[in-house]
Amino acid sequence: MKLNMTQLDMVRRQIDRVKAFEGGLYHKKYADITSADIQTAEDFLSLPFTEKDELRAVYPLGIQAVPDRDIVRIHSSSGTTGTPIIIPYTQKDVDDWATMFARCYAMAGITPEDRIHITPGYGLWTAGIGFQLGCEKLGAMAVPMGPGNTDKQLKMMMDLKSTVLCATSSYALLLAEEIAKRGIGDQIHLKKGVIGSERWGDKMRARIAAELGVELYDIYGLTEIYGPGVGINCQKEEPMHYWDDFVYIEIIDPVTGQPVPDGEIGEIVITTLQKEGAPLIRYRTHDLSRIVPEPCSCGSAFPRIDRIIGRSDDMIKVKGVNIYPGQVEDVLKNVAGVSSEYQVMIDHLNGRDIMTLFFEVEPEADRELVEIAVGAIFKAKVGLTIV
């Protein structure tokens, strides 16, 4: 999906701003680039990618693009895989984030009448505060629980009659199991769940929806790009609408870096169009998805990407075939009798790649028949024989 002229103008303004801020990441990175160089969508593709390692290299505040007096808060990545990335926000950034998140809630059919139970963490992490910002912008009641303390979570959920649950998929499943175990389902008033942060398969999705009795929505975002709230699926279809007046999304081949045709799976690359505190241009997220070119039956004109199927850095190559975790899940979800738990093991023996797939079979299923079915579908869909 090419940049339109409005987005192109916004990109040029971003280039002027980031180049003008001495000491910032792009002041040096774009030393030989000017906004006048970017006259077309094709010119935009000549801009270099921005990589996560570049953001880590300028820790703590090297990606800041405005004076300190304009910064009202910071958030940070966890730093579990390396140096944390600190993201500065201006007041406009915070307000824009709230606007995007409120759109997400509205897209899911959530209204000011709802009571929104927020379980993701607060503090430096963007999740909890992002869910709350959008809730307050929408005008709904925020119940800012944060993570943990299941007894307190369930008590507040019952006493306040919360109608929307915001959570990671694993925590939503834990709460669903606890509600079933305690036999308190008739005291729970949840109608919708907004789930983010973790990739989850269809079997897990169906289990949470059934046990909680809710409609589920996938919300997308990442710390470097505001946080959660960049996009969400609507009430009609599974792909996620994203807010292309705030972010431009392109999909590239993760190996060559070249754009792929709309509809093909590749790596998401994001350019922020209005961000002030820490704008990013052509930022490689390593998340895998595709542009969904067909118009949505909900009538929204906002463009769409498909659910995240994995990460380009999770890719493994077996016998010359690129395999992503999402492809394994796609196979398993189509075989009756297979649970949502699986493990893939890759061995290299005598010059040959051997892929072993371990998965759980539901108690009532015929294990031998299930194994045959999984092998056949994997061969047909992925092109590999598994053992």
Could you tell me what each predicted segment is?
Residues 84-88, 109-115, 142-145, 217:
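Short secondary-structure capping/junction motifs at helix and strand boundaries
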Residues 82-96, 132-142, 159-166:
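Acidic/glycine-enriched edge-of-secondary-structure segments
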Residues 1-19, 138-387:
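Active-site glycine/GP-rich loop and adjacent strand/helix microenvironment
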Residues 1-76, 82-99, 103-107, 188, ...:
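Nucleotide 5′-phosphate-binding alpha/beta core
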Residues 86-90, 110, 127-130, 176:
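Short, conserved acidic/polar surface loops in the N-terminal third of protein domains
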Residues 42-45, 98-115, 150-162:
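Conserved ATP-dependent adenylate/AMP-binding module captured primarily in the ANL superfamily
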Residues 94, 121-123, 170-171:
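Short glycine-enriched loops at secondary-structure junctions
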Residues 106-140:
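Conserved AMP-binding loop of ANL adenylate-forming enzymes
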